[in-house]
From Swiss-Prot:
UniProt keyword terms in alphabetical order: Cell cycle, Cell division, Centromere, Chromosome, Chromosome partition, Cytoplasm, Cytoskeleton, Kinetochore, Microtubule, Mitosis, Nucleus
Record GO biological process: attachment of spindle microtubules to kinetochore; cell division; mitotic sister chromatid biorientation; protein transport along microtubule to mitotic spindle pole body
Any Gene Ontology CC annotation: cytoplasm
Main location, first listed in the record: nucleus
Keyword Cell division: yes
Position of the signal peptide: none
InterPro entries from the UniProt entry: DASH_Dad4
Compartment(s): Nucleus; Cytoplasm, Cytoskeleton, Spindle; Chromosome, Centromere, Kinetochore
Subunit text: Component of the DASH complex consisting of ASK1, DAD1, DAD2, DAD3, DAD4, DAM1, DUO1, HSK3, SPC19 and SPC34, with a stoichiometry of one copy of each subunit per complex. Multiple DASH complexes oligomerize to form a ring that encircles spindle microtubules and organizes the rod-like NDC80 complexes of the outer kinetochore. DASH complex oligomerization strengthens microtubule attachments. On cytoplasmic microtubules, DASH complexes appear to form patches instead of rings.
A Pfam match: DASH_Dad4
Protein name (database record): DASH complex subunit DAD4
Length: 76
């Protein structure tokens, strides 16, 4: 005897499989974007470190050469 619910179960399973496939696609795209964001953040981190080292070098040079001046104050 044939299962009376087999067609409904088969249709439901097909919809689930289709939904999971779309979900996997979406997650793959999110992962790609996340990798791109991580890469850009890493680049920003490197630039930030370079700028901090440069600032430390400038501060050291100005202190050692006696050329460091007080910051400008605006008395408006």
């Amino acid at each position: 005897m044939e299962n009376p619910h087999e067609k409904d179960q088969s249709d439901a399973l097909a919809r689930i499989i289709s939904g999971v496939s779309k979900l996997n696609s979406s997650i793959a795209r999110v992962n790609e974007i996340q990798e791109e964001v991580y890469s850009r953040n890493l680049n920003l981190s490197v630039v930030s470190e370079i700028m901090q080292n440069y600032q430390a070098s400038v501060d050291y040079y100005l202190r050692e050469s006696g050329a460091m001046k007080e910051p400008f104050k605006n008395d408006d």
